[in-house]
């Protein structure tokens, strides 16, 4: 059985190599993709919340006060709601950082340091954060939250450093 998994592992590795190549074809690409993928994470956070609402007997009359049904959600559904809200908060911090880095690259050229890995890692960490929060795995959730916030901070620092150095 382990031998049968080898082609799958090789295919996944080749896919990841090609994906990284696609995401880094131009100096600005990682930051643009980071912005797009981070927005995708916000949209993805709706899925577990929608699943939870479907178990809480959501009706059209709940549209009058959608937050009022929160108490009817199962515990994991309440965590899904919090994860969804936190996704918006993380995006509002990350989007300006990604735009700043994108602007810095367009004005000054490629950024140094950890800017590209931070730009690509932030959406991945935020995507892992969602199931970690919904499944109530605090250590993983905390690591993903801190890692994503650190990636956003790196983008702010590298973008500002480039713009200040070029001024």
Residue ranges and their predicted role:
Residues 127-151:
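Interfacial loop-to-transmembrane junctions
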């Amino acid at each position: 059985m382990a031998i049968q998994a080898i082609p799958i592992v090789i295919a996944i590795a080749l896919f990841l190599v090609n994906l990284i190549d696609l995401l880094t074809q131009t100096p600005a690409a990682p930051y643009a993709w980071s912005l797009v993928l981070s927005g995708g994470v916000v949209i993805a956070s709706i899925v577990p919340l929608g699943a939870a609402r479907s178990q809480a007997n959501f009706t059209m009359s709940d549209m009058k006060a959608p937050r009022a049904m929160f108490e009817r959600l199962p515990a994991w559904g309440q965590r899904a709601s919090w994860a969804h809200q936190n996704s918006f908060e993380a995006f509002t911090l990350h989007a300006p950082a990604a735009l700043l880095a994108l602007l810095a690259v367009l004005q000054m050229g490629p950024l140094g340091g950890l800017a590209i890995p931070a730009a690509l890692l932030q959406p991945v960490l935020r995507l892992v954060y969602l199931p970690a929060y919904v499944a109530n795995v605090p250590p993983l959730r905390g690591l993903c939250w801190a890692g994503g916030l650190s990636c956003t901070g790196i983008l702010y620092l590298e973008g500002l450093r480039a713009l200040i150095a070029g001024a």
